[in-house]
């Protein structure tokens, strides 16, 4: 059988997969589902912030913004000129590598192939009008950066990086707040998918909406004994996955 993951459970792809499986008489089952943060609202950013974020958290954010501003000149920007891309991309790579990912060797800058892929992806997105790139600077130096990719009337969040030495000011949260204002202030963007893990404590506390992401198991074709064996394997796999989910949830 075939596993397909990362599918919007309520989207056209999931519906098409199920329709094809029904038509071809294939066994088809949803085996896993989780919800992740989604930003989708017709309200303005200030109203959304006041409605969906707890008063205590809003107060704490204002305090952090004030404390950070005491350190120097704070400037939030969205990249608008293609000529800025090389410098912005280089700044992002350096910022990510300056933290734990650099120490662990998992930052994009740690491998030449990953760096090249990232640069090519940003360049292609920029050329096609799909790049949404934000940053916060302290005295001209990037302390938080966020890369999003736009698609039709929506967008997907790709990567975030921030200065971990300034972690006490939550720069990652602050740039997500800038992002919230940018998205809800742009009539051409009706939604943004966080692409975050389930129950992510930071983004879940800011974005109120959720998108359900599913994994499906699809039986492969066969006949006679092969088909019987595959049907049995399909049933056994389903039972095992349900048992694993039960144990994990205890």
Predicted stretch roles:
Residues 1, 131, 186-189:
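Short, high-confidence coil segments that cap the C-terminus of an alpha-helix
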Residues 113, 156-157, 170, 189, ...:
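Alpha-helix boundary/interfacial micro-motifs
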């Amino acid at each position: 059988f075939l596993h397909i993951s990362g599918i919007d459970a309520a989207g056209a792809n999931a519906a098409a997969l199920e329709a094809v499986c029904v038509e071809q008489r294939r066994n088809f089952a949803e085996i896993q589902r989780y919800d992740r943060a989604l930003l989708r609202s017709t309200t303005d950013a200030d109203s959304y912030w006041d409605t969906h974020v707890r008063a205590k958290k809003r107060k704490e954010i204002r305090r952090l913004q004030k404390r950070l501003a005491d350190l120097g000149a704070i400037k939030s920007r969205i990249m608008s000129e293609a000529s800025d891309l090389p410098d912005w991309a280089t700044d992002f790579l350096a910022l990510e590598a300056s933290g734990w990912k650099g120490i662990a060797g998992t930052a994009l800058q740690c491998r030449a192939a990953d760096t090249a892929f990232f640069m090519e992806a940003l360049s292609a997105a920029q050329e096609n009008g799909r790049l949404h790139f934000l940053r916060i600077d302290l005295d001209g130096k990037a302390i938080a950066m966020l890369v999003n990719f736009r698609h039709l009337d929506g967008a997907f969040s790709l990567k975030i990086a921030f200065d971990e030495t300034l972690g006490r000011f939550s720069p990652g949260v602050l740039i997500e707040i800038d992002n919230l204002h940018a998205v809800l202030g742009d009539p051409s963007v009706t939604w943004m998918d966080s692409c975050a893990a389930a129950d992510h404590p930071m983004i879940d506390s800011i974005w109120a909406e959720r998108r359900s992401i599913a994994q499906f198991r699809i039986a492969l074709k066969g006949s006679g004994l092969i088909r019987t064996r595959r049907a049995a394997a399909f049933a056994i796999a389903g039972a095992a996955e349900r048992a694993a989910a039960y144990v994990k949830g205890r």
